[in-house]
Amino acid sequence: MKARALEHLFDDFGRSLDGLGEALGVGAEEPLAIDGTIQRFELTFELFWKVVRRLLARQGIEANSPRTVVQQAYRLGWLDDEQRWLKLLEDRNLTSHTYREALAQEIYSRIPAHHAAMREVAQKLSATS
């Protein structure tokens, strides 16, 4: 991928992280706020793994699924805790493929930690991109 295209993708990821942070600031009083925050979390994770996949490709590493991207990024030291990231991926998969109110509440409660983890990695990766 061309450097400019990766830069645009990384910028989109950064804006998505900011949007997720804004959504978390709204609070969880309304179900619509929870749903919107979960939707932003899904989008942010989608952009995260695509950015990392492109960075891995620059290293000559082929990773075509979010799970493989997480595993390879951990192997390179870009992620600090593989299990944490696999749990983040599991939460994204659960929110993308099912909807149950109790599950939404449970995952919503973990999104602030997921947001912080993605923000931390974004800062680390901005130095490598």
Where are these regions (language model features)?
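Solvent-exposed interaction patches of small proteins and small membrane subunits
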Residues: 1-129
